[in-house]
Every structure is written in structure tokens, then in C-alpha cells.
A protein has these predicted regions:
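Glycine-rich active-site loop/strand segments that organize a redox cofactor
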Residues: 50-95
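Hydrophobic alpha-helical segments, chiefly the membrane-spanning helices
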Residues: 136-142
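Short helix-loop-beta connector
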Residues: 2-4
Length: 142
């Protein structure tokens, strides 16, 4: 396990990898802690292995939350079009199935690779809930 890193992420799924991608682009070393043996397991099998990576018809109105403005902020900061642009920049071919669902033409592995391209130093550790591998100290909570 990495003894010192800039960012510790709990969860190696889609959101965790996206956070790791952003941190990597900013030159940060990243440690991802997850229960799965490999990161992105659910991404790898989603959409029959082709990854339903976004829905062009998603909107804040489709989400329920105690804070009804949260989704507005999230959708304003990063839209479906932003993710489609990322996929296009990585030359990943995709198609629309029904109701705005976008899938890779080939494999979900392409999306996983797209997320990890900018992670400069990644350490992935498989942890079960009852294991303790190290003492983690958080210096800054955002």
C-alpha cells in the first residue's frame, strides 16, 4: 500500500474513477480503496459489457433529493455533453439505443481506460469492510 498519497478515494466505481481522473490531471497521487478485487467492476459488466455511460435525457427533474437544488448544481458543472466530449476525445465509438441511452460500440473497458488516462500515480487496494490495512490520517476534508 502506498505510504503517502495526496488523495484517498473510497470506492473504485464510476464516481471514484472520475474523481481519480480529475485528481490525476491536477498532478495528485491517488489511493483508491474498494471492496472489489479490481476497480470499475460494475462499469465492466454494465450494459452487457458495453457500458451505458450516459443518458442524453437526464435532468434534475428526474432525481429525488432532500436538497432539490443539488442536482441542478451537479448538472450545471458537468453535463452529459461534457462526458460525450470526453468519450469523443478518446475516439470511443458509441451509439444511442433507446430513450437517449448511450453505449460503447465495443467494450466497457474503453470507458474505464478513458477514466484512468490522467491518473498519474494510482494505488488500488482491495479491502473488505472488516480489514484494516493502515492508519489513514486525513489532513484536509473538502
Amino acid at each position: 500500500m502506498t505510504e503517502r498519497c495526496d488523495v484517498v478515494l473510497i470506492g473504485g466505481g464510476a464516481a471514484g474513477l472520475m474523481c481519480a481522473r480529475v485528481a490525476g490531471r491536477r498532478g495528485r497521487s491517488v489511493l483508491i480503496l474498494d471492496h472489489a478485487k479490481r476497480p470499475a467492476e460494475k462499469i465492466r459488466i454494465s450494459g452487457g459489457g458495453r457500458c451505458n455511460f450516459t443518458n442524453m435525457h437526464s435532468s434534475p427533474a428526474a432525481f429525488l433529493s432532500n436538497n432539490r437544488h443539488f442536482c441542478k448544481s451537479a448538472f450545471t458543472r458537468y453535463t452529459q455533453d461534457d462526458f460525450v466530449q470526453l468519450v469523443t476525445e478518446h475516439q470511443i465509438a458509441f451509439h444511442e439505443k433507446k430513450l437517449g441511452q448511450l453505449f460503447c460500440d465495443d467494450s466497457a473497458q474503453q470507458i474505464i481506460g478513458c477514466d484512468t488516462t490522467y491518473i498519474y500515480t494510482v494505488s488500488y487496494t482491495h479491502l473488505r469492510a472488516h480489514e484494516t490495512k493502515a492508519n489513514l490520517v486525513c489532513r484536509l476534508l473538502l
